[in-house]
């Protein structure tokens, strides 16, 4: 099972050097045998707001690394023309000498679609066609479009990428249908434990691999990457107290984002909006505290190396191929960087234990 770093910052504090953790983490990952660095696409909210364009942050990661894969986790494809996605990531592929990869998401927050409002209703149904177009462009195939004069033109993107095929994952919060869709189309899966338990994840991975084998045979490589909130230390209770307050802020920020998403959904989200807005501050604190306890105990990788090894064993048994360690959930940058030494020891211990 591979290790990578994942970023999805809750930018709730003013920092002049707000990308220091990204760049120091990228160098750490490159030097310590990690597989990849993932950065997301988020818009119009402090939750993830450092990352409006993963191709830009990916280019920065490419510039300070030599070996580690540079990935989007994820590109919200309906917000962009497929040609722009192929062009931007071909640049990243060239800057990194063939290390680019992208997870593709359909998007969910209506406010994000202020960028491409015409794509909101078809964001899910058109996703596979968009991925197919990106893959064709990556292979140097031409696509037919209409230019500004109303004429049909055949276009090929530049610069030519280094890799003959673009590694692509399909992002899902746990939908069984999306797991199977990824398998049918020969895509990897990027997922998380925010709405699913490890046992449920194992069942979905099994269905994904079955669909992959049925439709792709032995000609491809099924791959499941799991985003996992991570902080490793030398004492479990010390880790708990280190992450409690920042991670609780992170969860509260996520709660606010859900409220805004419900508001943006208009009539469809009216009932949820009323319910969420009627939650008292005391009840909100209770919900956040409960969520923290659940994530800490069952849905994150927190604690000592020995304790985190047990979580890794569960994930490997579930069929996870790569643990994408989410490290930027509000803990002070210096503390996260100091904790990298323990994460490196976890990585090395796992490799020694499994032989790979």
Predicted region positions:
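Active-site mouth loops of central-metabolism enzymes
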Residues: 7-19, 75-83, 163-174, 230-233, ...
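Flexible, glycine-rich active-site loops centered on histidine and acidic residues
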Residues: 1-17, 78-149, 188-190, 194-202, ...
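Conserved, mostly hydrophobic/aromatic
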Residues: 29, 33, 41, 61, ...
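An alpha-helical appendage that flanks or caps ligand/catalytic pockets
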Residues: 121-157, 199-320, 351-354
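Glycine-rich, proline-tolerant flexible connector loops at the mouths of alpha/beta enzymes
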Residues: 36-57, 61, 76, 108, ...
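N-terminal beta1-alpha1-beta2 module of alpha/beta enzyme domains
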Residues: 1-64, 69, 164-166, 341-342, ...
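Hydrophobic faces of well-ordered beta-strands that scaffold small-molecule active sites
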Residues: 3-7, 37-39, 70-72, 100-104, ...
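Short, acidic/polar
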Residues: 16-28, 88, 172-180, 305-314
